[in-house]
Swiss-Prot record:
Modified residues (N-acetylalanine): 1
UniProt-annotated binding residues for Ca(2+) 1: 51, 53, 55, 57, 59, 62
Record-given protein name: Parvalbumin beta 2
Lineage, top ranks: Eukaryota, Metazoa, Chordata, Craniata, Vertebrata
Role this protein plays: In muscle, parvalbumin is thought to be involved in relaxation after contraction. It binds two calcium ions.
Residues binding Ca(2+) 2, per UniProt: 90, 92, 94, 96, 101
Keyword Cell wall biogenesis/degradation belongs to the record: no
GO molecular function, one term: calcium ion binding
Membership in a protein family: Belongs to the parvalbumin family.
Amino acid sequence: AFSGILAEADIAAALKACEAAGTFNYKAFFAKVGLTGKSADDIKKAFFVIDQDKSGFIEEDELKLFLQVFSAGARALTDAETKAFLKAGDSDGDGAIGVDEWAVLVKA
């Protein structure tokens, strides 16, 4: 799903670092997976991979399964992790993360 954008080894390392429930930190994950240093175009491409229902927004249910987009065997985020992730990215308070909010969140 992320071929040509992110390296498999970086994805594996980023997932390993947050295997335990409650240890997910979006800033650390974005940095480890190599997304932070990517071009605006690649960051947008990643958004559209994560936006599973193609609504143009990443909603709470998609955030909960965020890690599984990177690897099917990964865990779901806890409710607390999901809500913190959403709160960090949803700057306009509409309950979802749009593509522009995503770009800001990745570079935060």
